[in-house]
């Protein structure tokens, strides 16, 4: 009797969980797509000398931000740095 109850519950659990396995496979496919886009975004977020040549809209939807900074503490020479940023 206990064995038959066990098998009934076992098969109910399998039947109940089966759609979940299919959902997991669909989620895995959806999760791989943003990874490719994320790799492109990482290559776009680099230091630049200007925002003039924003290759293939790398900064979109972000913006390219530029500023000047001194090369070292004792130097008066400044260099321009640009970077894609969310803010």
Swiss-Prot record:
Transmembrane segments: none
Localisation per UniProt entry: Secreted
Signal peptide: 1-17
Organs and tissues of expression: Expressed by the venom gland.
Assigned keywords, A-Z: Calcium channel impairing toxin, Disulfide bond, Ion channel impairing toxin, Knottin, Neurotoxin, Secreted, Signal, Toxin, Voltage-gated calcium channel impairing toxin
Function: Modulates Cav2.1/CACNA1A voltage-gated calcium channels (P/Q-type currents) in rat cerebellar Purkinje cells and hippocampal CA1-CA3 neurons. At saturating concentrations (>10 nM) decelerates activation kinetics and slightly increases peak amplitude without affecting deactivation kinetics. In vivo, does not cause death when intravenously injected into mice. In rat models, through its activity on Cav2.1/CACNA1A, has an ameliorative effect on memory defects provoked by hyperstimulation of N-methyl-D-aspartate receptors (NMDARs) in the hippocampus.
Family note: Belongs to the neurotoxin omega-lctx family.
Name of the molecule in the record: Omega-lycotoxin-Am1b
Organism: Alopecosa marikovskyi
Taxonomic placement: Eukaryota, Metazoa, Ecdysozoa, Arthropoda, Chelicerata
């Amino acid at each position: 009797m206990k064995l038959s109850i066990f098998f009934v519950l076992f098969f109910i659990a399998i039947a109940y969980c089966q759609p979940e396995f299919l959902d997991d496979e669909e989620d895995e496919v959806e999760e791989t797509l943003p990874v490719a886009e994320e790799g492109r975004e990482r290559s776009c977020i680099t230091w630049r000398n200007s925002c003039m040549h924003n290759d293939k809209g790398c900064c979109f939807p972000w913006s390219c931000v530029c500023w000047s900074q001194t090369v070292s503490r004792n130097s008066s020479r400044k260099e321009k740095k640009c970077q894609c940023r969310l803010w």
